[in-house]
Amino acid sequence: MFWKWCFRLSIVFVGLWLLLDLSSRLGAEIFWFQEVGYLQVFLLRLASRGALWVVAVGVTAVYLWGNLTLAQRLKYPRSLKIAEVRREEAELSVGLKNFLSPQYSLLNAPKIHDAGHLKPFRLRWLLPLTVVFSLLAGLILVHYGKIALAYWYPAFNKNSLPIITPFRLETIWELGRQVFSQVLYLGLIVGVAIAILIYSQFFLRAIAVILSVVFGTILFHNWAKVLQYFSPTPFNSTDPLFGKDISFYIFSLPLWELLELWLMGMFLYGFIAVTLTYLLSADSLSQGIFPGFSPQQQRHLYGMAGLLMLMVAFSYWLSRYELVYSPRGVSYGASYTDVVVQLPIYNILCVLGLAIAFYLLWRTIFWRAKSQYRQFVFYGLGVYLFVVVAAGSVLPTVVQYLIVQPNELQREQPYIQRTIALTRQAFSLETIDARTFNPQGNLTTAAIQANDLTIRNIRLWDKRPLLETNRQLQQFRPYYRFPDADIDRYTLEAEAAANRPVNPNQLPAPTERRQVLIAPRELDYSAVPEQAQTWINQHLIYTHGYGFTMSPVNTAGPGGLPEYFVKDIAGSNEGALSTSSEAVRDSIPIGQPRLYYGEITNTYVMTGTKVRELDYPSGSDNAYNAYDGLGGVIIGNGWRRGLFAMYLKDWQMLFTQDFLPETKVLFRRDVKQRIQAIAPFLKFDSDPYLVAADGSPAFPGQNNYLYWIVDAYTTSDRYPYSDPDNNGINYIRNSVKVVIDAYNGSVKFYIADATDPIIATWSAIFPQMFQPLSDMPVTLRSHIRYPLDYFGIQSERLMTYHMTDTQVFYNREDQWQIPNEIYGSESRPVEPYYLITSLPTVPFEEFLLLLPYTPKQRTNLIAWLAARSDGENYGKLLLYNFPKERLVFGPEQIEARINQDPVISQQISLWNRQGSRAIQGNLLVIPIEQSLLYVEPIYLEATQNSLPTLVRVVVAYENRIVMAQTLEQALQAIFQPEVTPAPAIIRPFEEVTPPG
């Protein structure tokens, strides 16, 4: 008795704990979404998730539990003597009033005894049947459990996206092969099968309960598909196979596949569980014989088999549309074999499946104990399975090998064209403006001076050496860290670059655009000394980062160190950041430089407490601050403190004496986690970047000028005929720009591509969540840029899908690749790079993202892709193709020429032998008018205590290469009129001893 009471109390305690934990999570989420202004978004998600979970769990539990309960009533009693079954055949008629009676099996045992017409199963058939069905039950449990686990713990699945594979007749073998190849899952399946054979009643019901929760979890996490289904936006484009609008594949088909996944698993397990209940009744395995299915058992199984066959037919109906994702053939999507052979087979299997399903259901409703057509059911199912195997798998393979492959181009040509066209649509490649670029080689000093803005913004500093230098010169304390540096452009007063060379033929402009590297100085609490890592320090004192550095990309200061427009923390001036000139101070807002939200800000903190927050170091002392921003949730001294202590599992919050009524907790301060929590249906760029600008009045708050901008994407893997990338995505748009206030934590979503149907659907679902891009403050809008991740995906697809001729595509004769470059001493692919320059035929400079291409397995340039980022031209792509009959040097060829030059290679070797290391930076290919200029910086760093310095700049043009101390000197050496063009390589002016 004592142990029973202990067990009951423990159950009550665990239940209360789970209830409190769930309540705290719900309450904290409500308060947090209220803080960021997206409570309605959260409540709609919560309601839809809750409804889906209840429906899935309820329907599954009722169906499985109800059928298992009915099977318990209809099964043979354990006391039945099977040896007495073989008697004279007797008619068995049992009324429906007894069919549902709990005492059915006992009341009708004598009749069952007399059912001599039943066909018994001997042990040689009974044992394999029960083992196979038990293994299938285990396979179902493991398969759907893996899917649910991948949703619940994304890290469980290496791709973070569970692959939904429904149980279909043609995929069961493949699923079994995959699962059985893993020892853990194999052991689990075998263990489940053995448990079912020994304790069938308990484990079959237990699995039913588990599957109910599993299906609830799967539907719970697929709430987005349901909401999209009810608010679709047409693409106004149809697929070439079925003529359906693309929106059917993006919004409708995923929901039908989700329903198939759920109902197929539910009906299949229900049929298996009920069959096992009957087969294992009457102690059949011990007696070595099963008397056969009674008429009412048959009626029950007919009904369940009818529902299962209905789902099989539905599955083949869906398989028809899934042919547009077929990998068979030379191109993605439905190929010749799929359209001519596989599609008719699926149509036939769908119709046959429906016919069998309706027949089984009709027999269930209008049951006759004896029927002359009963044997036709088994024959029909046998024929159906034969058609599935023979026609569904063997015939398409034979056609592919014997008919298609000998005449592949002729057969597949129209389908290749479909793949090309729809892949280009899905990745927005069809909007690329393709032009011819024929380098003239007539660049002069006058042309260089005319493109002065381009020259002044050639990037000599890469973010890697700059960050190394920042960490040495600008971190100040161990707990500060520069996690990243980002390229951007700012409009500065002309005085900001007084030392730059001036074109005498141009009047000085009142402002100029400068390309810069901006790096936030964030707080890294993990770098705080271990002895100081106390609860108060972590959550009350070390609360925020401070300021940023901003460096021009094209100049170096004394000793080759980077110059700074913005740097330091001027402790003598109330923590203001230092600027290089008054012009910079007037051009770049530097007030309120505190970073409470950032890329590595992953701790929760409490502000407005009795403890002062560390603000910034001031000499040998520290300055302190009290947060007065709009972020955070008030917890004070009341019940909210207990709620958040439970939510954060931080019990010291309950006992600290440092809280005040106005105390607030700031959590989810990592900008990517913050926006992911608000909009999990979007994909976000891997590189948030900091902007210093005045965001008022869109962002409330006083004197705050630091904002994070993150690009967000709408993606899909269901675009018909579109060849997916390496991540499985076959549709993507950069539809949203997200802005996060670095001080207040406010988040706003702006629609950057209103033509995208997916973002239009989400905007209809959450009408108050998104704003048009025109509502973004102009000061912030001037800093949006074409995102690197999006550009990388498009440029990768373009390597193949620039070929629009089907024969050229089939032969892959014009395949491109991204060239390699030498960075440091390692060869690596060229990364896209930002540049301020003017495009050919465009009379003004603009902020571009560039990437060169070379032919497959060759090193000469074949094309370069440019993405525009300024004003009305934002988002436009231009592709410049080089003439194939002329050699245009690629990055690898220029790198080889640099390293083969005896003077340059000798100097690099000399640096590498003096306790230092020479680093060859990014090689930039820069279009200027109708010519190409190649620029590569060379850095020098010590092997210990690395502090990279810019020591040389290499410039290549046509067949000339120069290495000099500065870019201006290198350009002068190449383009000065008095130098004759005879030498292939012009040597550097002087050999300068590297800094010691």
Curated annotation (Swiss-Prot):
Keywords: Cell membrane, Membrane, Transmembrane, Transmembrane helix. The keyword rRNA processing does not apply. One of its GO terms (cellular component) is extracellular region. The chain crosses the membrane at residues 12-34, 51-71, 125-145, 183-203, 207-227, 261-281, 301-321, 339-359, 376-396. Pfam families: UPF0182. It is a multi-pass membrane protein. The keyword Lipid metabolism does not apply. Its main location: membrane. It is found in: Cell membrane. InterPro entries: UPF0182. Belongs to the UPF0182 family. This is UPF0182 protein Ava_3693. It comes from Trichormus variabilis (strain ATCC 29413 / PCC 7937) (Anabaena variabilis).
